[in-house]
């Protein structure tokens, strides 16, 4: 599924034109109203390999009535640092407190126009507090 291209400036609403950008060495959307280039917009999310202090267990969750277990994940809020989003999402979905965060890798998913940042999140204990965010865990 192709990602839709921006047609109008998100700042002022002016129709965008394509203009050569010297630094990018290609044409980029340009707003004549703002006199600025408009680079593609995408979602940013985090996924976490949630593990205990001894790193001998990994937490997987089921959500939204789906059949398979997945990593804890969620979107980064505007203005939020990725590491903060890691701790927030783990706490919201499991009730666990993150003590250490390490970046692993990133991957762009065209289908949802999302850049996914993967981290290892070490938590204090594995006593998950079930709530409406998850269906089950293991």
Located regions from the model:
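Unchanged
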Residues: 76-100, 105-138
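A generic fold-level signal
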Residues: 4, 43, 53, 111-114, ...
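Conserved Nudix-box catalytic region and its N-terminal flanking loop in Nudix hydrolases
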Residues: 49-92, 105
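Conserved beta-strand segments that form the floor/walls of ligand-binding pockets within enzyme
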Residues: 30, 70, 118
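Nudix hydrolase/Nudix homology domain
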Residues: 1-5, 67-69, 131-138
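Acidic, metal-coordinating catalytic segment for phosphate/diphosphate chemistry
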Residues: 2-48
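Surface-exposed, flexible loop/turn segments at secondary-structure boundaries
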Residues: 17, 56, 66, 109-111, ...
């Amino acid at each position: 599924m192709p990602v839709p291209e921006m047609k109008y400036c998100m700042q002022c609403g002016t129709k965008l034109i394509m203009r050569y950008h010297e630094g990018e060495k290609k044409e980029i959307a340009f707003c004549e109203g703002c006199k600025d280039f408009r680079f593609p917009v995408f979602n940013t999310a985090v996924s976490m390999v949630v593990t205990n202090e001894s790193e001998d267990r990994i937490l997987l969750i089921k959500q939204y009535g789906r059949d398979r277990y997945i990593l804890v994940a969620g979107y980064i809020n505007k203005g939020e640092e990725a590491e903060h989003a890691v701790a927030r999402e783990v706490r919201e979905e499991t009730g666990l407190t993150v003590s250490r965060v390490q970046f692993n890798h990133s991957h762009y998913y065209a289908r949802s126009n999302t850049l996914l940042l993967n981290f290892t999140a070490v938590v204090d204990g594995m006593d998950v507090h079930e709530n409406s965010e998850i269906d089950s865990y293991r």
